[in-house]
Regions:
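Cysteine-nucleophile amide-bond enzymes
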Residues: 1-273
Length: 273
C-alpha cells in the first residue's frame, strides 16, 4: 500500500503567501462586485456580495496555510486498493466525469469567477464511482493535491448536486490514464491555488481539478475540444461538447439527510463558439 504523507510545514519564506492570496482574492471579489454594480448586472453583484458577507473568502484564506503552490505536498494519496479497483474496471468501455455543485466556500469563490454553479470536476474508471479521483484542497487531514473522492463526500453539503457523464474509452486509453495516475501518486502533487488567479503552474503535477481532468483526457487522446489546460473550467467539458461525445448517466443530490439519484434531467447545452 502506498505511504500517505501529510502536508509538510510551510517554509517560513512562503508563510506570507497565504494572507497575500487571501487579500488578493478579497480585492478581486470586491472588484467584481463594483464592476457588476456599475454595469447594472444585479445578479452578479448580489452573488459577489454574498461571497463576501458569508465569509467565503475568509474561510478560504484561513485554509491557505495548508497549500503549497511551489512544491509537492501530497504523495501516496492513492492506495493499492484504489489501483486494484481501477484496474478491474479497465474493460468497462467508458471513463466517467462527475461535475459537482458543492456549495463550499472555495466553490462559491470559484463560481463567482467562472459564472457557473458547477465548480468541480472529477473522473472515475468505473460506473459505481468507486474510483473517483481529482485534484482538491484535501479533506479529513489529506494534503491538497491529487486525492481519491467519494460521491457522498462530493454531495455532503445541503443543496449540493453531482452530475455524472460517461465518455467512450478503450482499455488502452484507460491504461494510459491509470499509468499517469501512478506516476503522479509516486512523484507527488499539490493543488494549483495560484492557477485560479493567474494562468500558471509552477510544476507539472501542480494542478486544479479541471486542469487535471483535461490533461488526463488529452494524454489518452480522449479530449474533444482544444483549450489551454490552465483556462479550462469544469463546465467546459459539457458546454464544449459540440458533437455529443458525453452521455448523461445520473444526477445525485443531497437534501441534508439522504442522497438522491435521478437518471433523467435536461442536459446543459453547448455554448462555446
Amino acid at each position: 500500500m502506498s505511504e500517505r504523507k501529510q502536508a509538510p510545514e510551510t517554509p517560513w519564506y512562503l508563510r506570507p503567501f497565504g494572507p497575500l492570496v487571501s487579500l488578493a482574492l478579497l480585492c478581486v471579489v470586491w472588484g467584481v462586485y463594483g464592476k457588476a454594480r456599475l454595469s447594472g448586472r444585479r445578479t452578479r453583484a448580489q452573488r459577489a456580495w454574498q461571497v463576501v458577507s458569508q465569509g467565503c473568502v475568509y474561510d478560504l484564506g484561513r485554509d491557505l496555510t495548508r497549500h503549497n503552490c511551489f512544491r509537492y505536498c501530497n504523495r501516496g494519496s492513492l492506495s493499492s486498493a484504489y489501483f486494484a479497483q481501477a484496474t478491474a474496471a479497465l474493460s468497462d468501455g467508458y471513463i466517467y466525469l462527475a461535475l459537482t455543485h458543492s456549495n463550499s466556500p472555495a466553490g462559491e469563490v470559484i463560481g463567482l469567477f467562472t459564472g457557473r454553479a458547477y465548480n468541480h470536476i472529477s473522473l472515475a474508471f468505473d460506473r459505481a464511482l468507486k474510483t473517483l479521483v481529482s485534484y482538491n484542497g484535501g479533506e479529513g487531514g489529506e494534503a491538497p493535491g491529487l486525492n481519491p473522492e467519494t460521491l457522498k463526500g462530493l454531495a455532503e453539503r445541503k443543496g449540493a448536486s453531482v452530475r455524472v457523464y460517461r465518455l467512450v474509452a478503450t482499455r488502452h486509453q484507460k491504461q494510459i490514464m491509470l499509468k499517469r495516475l501512478r506516476k503522479i501518486n509516486q512523484e507527488g502533487s499539490a493543488y494549483n491555488l495560484l492557477g485560479l488567479l493567474f494562468p500558471m503552474s509552477c510544476q507539472p503535477n501542480i494542478m486544479f481539478c479541471s486542469q487535471f481532468v483535461y490533461a488526463m483526457l488529452r494524454l489518452a487522446g480522449l479530449h474533444y475540444f482544444r483549450k489551454n489546460p490552465l483556462q479550462v473550467r469544469p463546465t467546459d467539458f459539457v458546454e464544449w461538447d459540440r458533437r455529443g461525445r458525453l452521455a448523461f448517466v445520473a444526477e445525485f443530490t443531497f437534501d441534508g439527510v439522504c442522497l438522491h439519484c435521478q437518471d433523467s434531467i435536461p442536459q446543459m447545452r453547448p455554448t462555446a463558439g
